[in-house]
A protein has these predicted regions:
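N-terminal glycine-rich phosphate-binding loop and ensuing alpha1 helix
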Residues: 1-70, 77-78, 82-87, 95, ...
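Short beta-strand segments
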Residues: 5-7, 62, 113-116, 146-149, ...
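Hydrophobic packing residues within well-ordered alpha-helices of enzyme cores
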Residues: 14, 71-72, 184, 210
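Short, solvent-exposed loop/turn segments at the edges of secondary structure
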Residues: 21-22, 155, 170
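Acidic-glycine-rich active-site phosphate/pyrophosphate-binding loop
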Residues: 63, 67-75, 171-180
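Catalytic core of tubulin tyrosine ligase-like
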Residues: 150, 159-219
Length: 219
């Protein structure tokens, strides 16, 4: 399986510390995992975790051309798929799969797990991501999602509504995008999961969709 880190956002939630020129994922605000007093960026932290999990060599970071040098200055060995313009998540996924197939050594039968660049998570998160390929094959699904059990009725996350429970996976009955607090509490009682923004697709399926839109499958 291959992995995609989406890093193309403008990251202005920490303004004025972060801005268009220096999005939040590149600010050195978090402690390194080695218990030193040094700080690192969210990108550097997640990249170190990917290396520890044995995933970094099969990972591409997808970002705009204006962020390329920032990425290289922080994770020199990273492979980067450069977006010519912002086209939101689906456009970034199309571009990433085209890069993996034409530049990254992937075949159309390989799977790609797409992740945000700035999760503040532990080792178990990455071990779960690794399981997505097997779940996709067992379930026959076109898209695999990763959810988290909510700890409070957040209005900042989307919710995945669970369907039938299978051996190691749950079918998806529906979604609720950033509900109000009352609705979020109701969803929690129904066993809904937070949408982590992590999903898995077969590369060939995405390239086929790209061609149907008149977009070339080569990067």
């Amino acid at each position: 399986m291959y992995y995609v880190l989406l890093s193309g956002g403008s990251g202005r939630r920490l303004w004025p510390l972060s801005n268009e020129a220096r999005p939040k994922q590149y600010l050195k605000l978090v402690n390194k995992e080695d218990n030193s007093m040094e700080r690192c960026s969210m990108l550097q932290r997640v990249w170190a975790q990917l290396k520890e999990a044995g995933m970094a060599e099969r990972t591409v970071i997808t970002a705009g051309a204006d962020q390329r040098e920032l990425i290289k200055s922080q994770v020199r060995e990273a492979q980067i798929a450069v977006e010519p313009g912002r086209r939101d998540t689906f456009g970034a996924v199309l571009l990433s799969c085209a890069w993996l197939w034409s530049r990254g050594g992937a075949s159309k039968d390989d799977y790609a797990a797409v992740m945000p660049v700035d999760p503040y998570t532990e080792e178990a998160y990455f071990e779960t991501v690794k399981q997505l390929e097997e779940v996709m094959k067992k379930s026959g699904a076109e898209v695999g999602l990763m959810g988290a059990v909510p700890s409070y009725p957040s209005v900042k996350y989307g919710y995945i509504l669970p369907g039938e429970r299978k051996d190691g996976w749950i079918s998806v009955k529906g979604f609720a995008e950033k509900p109000d607090e009352e609705k979020a509490e109701e969803l929690m009682k129904q066993g809904a999961l937070w949408n982590c923004g992590v999903f898995c697709v077969r590369i060939g399926d995405i390239l086929k969709r790209a061609v149907s839109y008149g977009v070339p499958e080569d990067y």
